[in-house]
């Protein structure tokens, strides 16, 4: 009776999920951040999965969703294909979505190098009408949803526990990064997008080969003796020279060269391979995971491309005399919407508290926002000219063009280092 796990299972109740540090942009999920970065740093590089639960007794939309880091999506989709019938809580079948978001503790855990997932809770009207209000009460408790989530994640926990190598598929990250790369902006800014495109394509193919090896090892080993596979030593995986391929991408351009990609991994090498995979996962989090001013998880080159697009459009609008259109674009850049509504002291405070503090205060937001541009003088100057009916925007155009050049330079450097 019961279940005897192969791995150590830890059950954590995190503190300070909603608030944990005063006067910081990143004041939530501080308990989870401190738990893994300060209290238990030894978890990093050894824990193979974090399963987070948010409102598991509430129906969110018409189906259950598991929101995951990109690297676990392949395994999760395969898991759903073999899922037995569960308590009928939703009219539609369960789906996987990615990436994870900053709104729950799994983000703090993931950037520490621990692959994470959560029952997706951001869908449905409840989040807009009841969540975090006096209208959020036990009347929304749904017994079937609660039971279904226990069944779903209980089976998932056992499926992960049965793996002998952490089932991370890095190809999806490389593919998504490639899809987000805009060749037009590479051409406009002089960034070497073709090099990055080649590297990402090669990394995608090689990561798929590596995952096939891991998948076969897990499928055939389960609780059996994996040492019976009798294949060549695989300890060289993910340790070859990276050349000019970049800190993360290069690990995949050569990591399966010289190995039989159809073969399983010998039992003696599974832990070594697992450590390598978790190390690469950490590198991917450090390299590819950035956030915009409002906590949305994005690729770094995607953030810069969007900012360049808005800047280019604002300059064009001003040259055409379309002031309102230019202001709408500036409103969308970083925190500059504050410049439309508040005095400069307020603007500077709410900019500084997200950028100019130590890591112990910025927590999981440390270094995640890139390329901020202060357009308070530009915005207030344009608003004043709008009141006066002035149509000479020469000064503001010059300031925006200078910002465009700074962003272009940052974009080139980012493309060169990915």
Q: Where are the predicted features?
A:
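Secretory-pathway/membrane protein signature
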Residues: 1-418
């Amino acid at each position: 009776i019961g279940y005897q796990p192969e791995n150590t299972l830890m059950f954590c109740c995190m503190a300070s999920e909603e608030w944990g540090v005063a006067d910081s942009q990143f004041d939530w999920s501080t308990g989870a951040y401190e738990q893994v970065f300060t209290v238990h740093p030894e978890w990093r590089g050894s824990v193979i999965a974090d399963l987070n639960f948010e409102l598991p007794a509430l129906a969110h939309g018409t189906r259950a969703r598991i929101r995951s880091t990109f690297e676990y999506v392949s395994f999760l989709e395969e898991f759903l294909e073999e899922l037995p019938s569960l308590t009928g809580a939703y009219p539609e079948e369960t789906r996987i979505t990615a990436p994870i978001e900053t709104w729950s503790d799994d983000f703090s855990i993931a950037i520490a190098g621990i692959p994470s997932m959560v029952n997706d809770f951001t869908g449905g009207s409840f989040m807009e009408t009841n969540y975090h209000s006096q209208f959020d009460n036990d009347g929304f408790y749904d017994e079937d949803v609660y039971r279904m989530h226990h069944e779903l994640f209980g089976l998932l926990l056992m499926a992960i526990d049965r793996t002998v190598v952490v089932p991370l598929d890095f190809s999806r990250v490389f593919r998504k990064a490639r899809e987000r790369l805009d060749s037009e902006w590479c051409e406009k800014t002089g960034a070497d997008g073709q090099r990055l495109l080649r590297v990402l394509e090669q990394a995608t193919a090689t990561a798929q080969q590596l995952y096939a090896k891991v998948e076969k090892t897990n499928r055939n080993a389960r609780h059996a003796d994996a040492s019976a596979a009798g294949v060549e030593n695989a300890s060289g995986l993910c340790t070859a020279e990276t050349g000019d391929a970049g800190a993360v991408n290069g690990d995949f351009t050569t990591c399966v060269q010289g190995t039989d990609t159809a073969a399983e991994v010998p039992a003696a090498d599974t832990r070594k391979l697992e450590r390598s995979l978790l190390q690469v996962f950490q590198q991917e989090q450090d390299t590819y995971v950035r956030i915009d001013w409002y906590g949305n998880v994005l690729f770094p080159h995607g953030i810069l491309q969007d900012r360049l697009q808005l800047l280019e459009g604002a300059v064009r609008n001003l040259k055409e005399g379309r002031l309102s259109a230019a202001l709408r674009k500036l409103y969308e850049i970083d925190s500059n919407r504050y410049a439309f509504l508040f005095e400069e002291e307020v603007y500077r405070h709410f900019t500084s508290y997200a950028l100019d503090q130590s890591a112990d205060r910025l927590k999981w937001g440390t270094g995640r926002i890139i390329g901020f541009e202060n357009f308070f003088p530009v915005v207030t100057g344009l608003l004043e000219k709008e009141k006066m009916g002035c149509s000479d925007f020469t000064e503001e155009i010059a300031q925006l063009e200078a910002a465009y050049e700074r962003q272009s330079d940052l974009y080139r450097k980012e493309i060169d280092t990915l």
